[in-house]
Amino acid sequence: MSGARAAPGAAGNGAVRGLRVDGLPPLPKSLSGLLHSASGGGASGGWRHLERLYAQKSRIQDELSRGGPGGGGARAAALPAKPPNLDAALALLRKEMVGLRQLDMSLLCQLYSLYESIQEYKGACQAASSPDCTYALENGFFDEEEEYFQEQNSLHDRRDRGPPRDLSLPVSSLSSSDWILESI
């Protein structure tokens, strides 16, 4: 980086801290330790060393992203080609995030639907286990307004059919938080 220059009036440690590259903001304070260790006395020797380190790091990252000798070939083959610029990369990232959010909402809706179905099934099992509610299970009526009619019809149906049938189903004693673990 031949554009490196010392800030006017800077000397000693201040010279290292005041180094700037044309077109770039000043180096953050958190990286000043790197400059001090790399400079070794002369500021120009330190920058050359940093340039070599940066070039080597860039080569390694390029090889890894291309799947070169670094062993990243399988990973690079699974990823789509790099977008040509930052705007394209951001657009691609935004598109992937929207897709992930839609998938997340879809899975959440399916999970909630499954939870509601399980709660209905538990209610049906509990209704079936009670001795006076066989009609509700057979016809799917669970409305409180029709409770009177259900009881009357179930009593009438029992007399017509003869001895009562055993419609008991196994009732699980799962709490509301255990149903997820049980379903997996």
UniProtKB/Swiss-Prot annotation:
This is Protein FAM89A. PANTHER family: LEUCINE REPEAT ADAPTER PROTEIN 25, PROTEIN FAM89A. Residues 154-164 have a biased composition (Basic and acidic residues). Residues 167-184 have a biased composition (Low complexity). Residues 148-184 are annotated as: Disordered. Belongs to the FAM89 family. The gene is FAM89A.
